[in-house]
Amino acid sequence: ISHARGKQFLYDEGTHIPLVIKGPGAPKGKKRNDLIEHIDIAALSLAAAGIQIPQKMEGQDILSSKHQPKKFIFAARDRCGEAADQIRSVRSKDFLYIKNFFPERPHLMPSNYKDSKLIIKRLRDLHAEKKTNTLTNKLLFSPIRPREELYLYNHDQWQTKNLAENKKYEKTLTELRKNLAHWIVQTGDPGPETLDVYILETEDQMSSTGNKVSRENYRKNSELYKKWFKDGK
């Protein structure tokens, strides 16, 4: 869960995974700053095992002499448990662009999984006691989120200064927005599930939740999300 903006979100805190490679064919003592994605690990593993990479695979063998570093990498988040969301992002060497498809929903939406964690409980308690600072209130407890977020890595390591409305970066924002839109079409991104599918999935998950308190929290949360679906929120 990290500090509430990590797991299940598309900031670096939730997506950046250090990669260390050791073995035959791996150069020793070399550091690289390439942009790579999880899907590249499958291609890399096949190549390391001497298996031909299928042409239909999007992943790349990053140790190949023919490897061309990517200009952009992409990430996505949808429903996690009963917490229905739709977030997409694209990252370049210098910038991170995030699009929230449900900006009317709060950042820390109700989640039986997350709300059971001590860090989230403590943060919610501190906020209720008015002991959280302005930045925390803005990033975690705002009732709505920006539709678009843009962050400059070298000057904003933790992605707290949204530049999406800064005219200075309008060209960058437009470029990344177009690249994300192209990726969504190219990959056939289906978007969020329908309300009917949400109901079927969450009812199945709720029935397998053993703890009575957790099951009741899950039920209350899913009822709220169903209302949001119907309200177009």
Question: Which residues does each PLM region occupy?
Answer:
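Non-catalytic, well-ordered alpha-helical segments in soluble enzyme domains
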Residues: P24-G25, N33-Q68, H155, K168
